[in-house]
Every structure is written in C-alpha cells, then in structure tokens.
Regions:
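Short alpha-helical transmembrane segments in multi-pass integral membrane proteins
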Residues: 1, 47-102, 158-222, 265-310
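Short runs within selected transmembrane alpha-helices of multi-pass transporters and secretion channels
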Residues: 1-14, 22-30, 55-70, 151, ...
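Small-residue-rich hydrophobic transmembrane alpha-helices
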Residues: 3-22, 132-196, 226-240, 244-245
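Hydrophobic faces of transmembrane alpha-helices in multi-pass small-molecule transporters and flippases
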Residues: 20-27, 69-72, 87-118, 123, ...
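Recurrent gating helices in multi-pass secondary carriers
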Residues: 30, 109-117, 129, 133, ...
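Aromatic-anchored segments of alpha-helical transmembrane domains
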Residues: 33-34, 253-259
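Structural signal for membrane-spanning alpha-helices in multi-pass inner-membrane proteins
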Residues: 37, 41, 70-74, 120, ...
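Helix-terminus/linker motif at the lipid-water interface of multi-pass membrane proteins
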Residues: 41-50, 113-137, 142, 160-161, ...
Length: 310
C-alpha cells in the first residue's frame, strides 16, 4: 500500500514544481530501507532473523516512510490544492482526462517488460548474447534515468505554460528540455564508449565480456535519440498529446525494434553476420522513432501552441 500513496504524493509535489521535496521523500525511504535490510535479514539487537521476509518488510517500511513524509510535504507546501471529502466524488470527465494522458505511460511501462522478454527469446540461440543484453540493459536504464528525470521536470513546466497560454514559455521549455537532455545523453555516450571494459568488470560480465563490450559500443549510439524520444513523450503529455506519446512508445519498444531484431537474428543464426548486427536494431529504431517524433512535435506545436497569442 505504501507505494500507492508514495507515487501519488510524489507526482503531486512534482506537478507543483516542488521536485526537491519529492526527491527528499524518495531518498528518506531508500535510506530507511538500506538501514533496515541487514537488521531485519540477519537479526540485529532485539530484531529476530527473518531472511528474505525481513528484506520484504524493510522495503515496505521504507515505502511507508516515503509516503508519510511526502504526505506531510504535500499538506504543508501544496497550498494550490483544496482538500475535502467533496473532492472524493468521482468525476467522469476528470477520470477520462487522467487516463488520456496517463494510459500511454502505463502501456509504455508494460511494453518495456515485453520488449526485454521478447529480446531474450530472439537471443536464445546465444546464452552469452542473452547475458550481455541483460547486463547492458542495466547500464542503459542508468543512463536513460537522466532523461526520465529531465522529462519529469519539463513536463509540469510546459504544462503550466500551456495552461497559462504562454507561447514563449512553452517554446523555451521545449527548447531547453531537448537541449539539456541531448547534452546528458552525449555525456552518457562518451562514458560508455570510452570505458566499456570498466563497465564489463563492474558488472562481472565474465565469459560474456566481449559480447557485452560489443553491445555497449553499438547500442550506446542510440542514447542521444532515445533521450530525445523520452523528452518528446514528456512534451506531448504536457500538451495533452497522449496518443502521440503512446505511438512513440509502441515504435520504440514493439513495432520497429522487435521485428528488426528478429530479422537480423535470422542472418546471425545462418552465419551470415555476427551478433553485433542485432545490436544495430537499437540505434536504427531510436533514430526512426526520433524522426517520427519530430513530425509529431511540429504538428502539436502548430495546432496547440502557435494559436496562442502571448
């Protein structure tokens, strides 16, 4: 239950531009979890040894701590919100608007799991390639979390500007959001391209080391396009473009990447190419989605931004 309220109050604080307090709540829960893990797993002091069950308890307690802290921040700081039982009455119009924007994000999360599962099936012919992909996926998520963070920052800013009817602020939010995201992604590319061996050692790639390094050198090229796609999705959501956000998610994680990787794997299994051919499916997919995303952005700007008067 803690994660439900944690997520709710975290987003309410982010929506009012109080991301610092959102971060404090997250960190507090994580610290409590880290402290309680060894205590409850191995049994320290009056706490009995609980093993894996103890780790689960520590996680739940950490989530509850975060939820309570974020709730306090929300009540004390988010004066923009009015609270009361009368606001608990379901409103079909509001629910529809919430799902119009939120459903694409829900589907995107589900697609991520589906993509990883199917990619592992595609790579089934090579256990080393499977392992390399699994390890690199962790590195990729670490880099893309930078883009996710900026997306969460620019979405409320652009949404505020859109609600105010400020064309200049919307354009500034889009410009700087894309620019800063690109800078961070270029940094991510440089780090992964220059130090692939260090990452292989860090993640204990073992016999999959060469596959891991090969995957990193090729797939990391896609970071710049992937980061921009993530930013695009935040911009679309801020401008009430949930469908465009959903389409980009489908292109990136299902429609292009999986058929392309599947086709490339046929050539690899027949000995006509190396496993590296499959890794090229990632940059190609992100570039294609990025180009389509740019078209969507121009369309949304023309329809929803250019008509604004100030």
């Amino acid at each position: 239950m803690g994660i439900i309220f944690f997520s709710l109050f975290e987003k309410l604080l982010q929506a009012t531009g109080r991301s610092l307090y959102s971060t404090i709540g997250q960190v507090a829960g994580a610290v409590v979890n880290i402290i309680l893990d060894p205590i409850m797993i191995y049994g320290i002091g009056p706490v009995p040894e609980m093993g894996v069950q103890g780790a689960a308890y520590a996680t739940v307690i950490g989530q509850v701590v975060s939820a309570v802290l974020l709730f306090i921040f929300h009540i004390k700081l988010n004066k923009e919100f009015e609270h009361g039982a009368k606001y608990m009455k379901p409103d079909a119009g509001i629910i529809k608007e919430i799902y119009a924007i939120g459903l694409p994000a829900i589907i995107a999360q589900a697609l991520m799991s589906i993509m990883v599962y199917v990619m592992n099936l595609i790579l089934k012919f090579s256990p080393s390639a499977q392992t390399a992909y699994g390890l690199f996926y962790k590195v990729q998520q670490f880099v893309l979390f930078l883009a996710f963070g900026l997306r969460d920052a620019i979405t409320p800013i652009i949404a505020f500007a859109y609600g105010m009817g400020s064309k200049k602020r919307i354009k500034d939010g889009i410009k700087y959001g894309l620019m800063y995201t690109s800078v961070l992604m270029i940094f991510g590319i440089l780090i992964t391209e220059i130090f692939p061996s260090s990452f292989a050692t860090l993640f204990n790639a073992g016999s999959s080391r060469e596959y891991f390094i090969g995957a990193m050198r090729i797939i990391s090229i896609s970071f710049i396009f992937a980061g921009i796609n993530v930013a695009y999705q935040g911009i679309y959501q801020a401008l009430d473009g949930g469908m465009e956000s959903l389409i980009i998610s489908l292109l990136r994680q299902l429609v292009i990447i999986l058929p392309l990787a599947g086709i490339f794997s046929i050539f690899v299994r027949k000995g006509r190419a190396g496993v590296s051919l499959i890794w090229w499916a990632f940059p190609i997919t992100e570039l294609a989605a990025c180009l389509i995303g740019f078209v969507f952005l121009k369309k949304i700007q023309k329809i929803k931004v250019e008509r604004l008067t100030h």
